[in-house]
């Protein structure tokens, strides 16, 4: 429910924003790459690599703009979550490094520094003992909200995962 409210607020604040939905590969089924079974198609001319690099830079700039636009909408929501979602007392005192607002600020800063945050990063921090399980859950929720509000973030996360992010 909160994600839908945030998306509504985000859509009201954005102006002159257009998502690119025209995908030539899916619109033109005749253009298929001839490939031998068991072979991976990975050879690309230099001009294609330059085009890919330019496309990655363009996508990163769009992500920065999307994040800059959604940050003022998400910040009050994170502050509200901080006040309303107190951790239950379990008998153990767990020192938390991050709260909701700090997660938002951390992920925002990472994106502005052109580092693409993803779930694998949060899992690695958890396994390394840097953050607790609860902090990881909070970070994943904030990242999920950012993915829902910033359409470019999942695309760049995918490029990062397959090793094509330049």
UniProtKB/Swiss-Prot annotation:
InterPro entries named among the record's database cross-references: C_Hendra
Keywords: Host-virus interaction, Inhibition of host innate immune response by virus, Interferon antiviral system evasion, Viral immunoevasion
Gene Ontology BP terms: symbiont-mediated suppression of host innate immune response
Domain of life: Viruses
Pfam hit, one: C_Hendra
Keyword match Lipid metabolism: no
Function: May counteract the cellular interferon antiviral system.
Any further remark recorded for this protein: The P/V/C gene has two overlapping open reading frames. One encodes the P/V/W proteins and the other the C protein.
Name under which the protein is recorded: Protein C
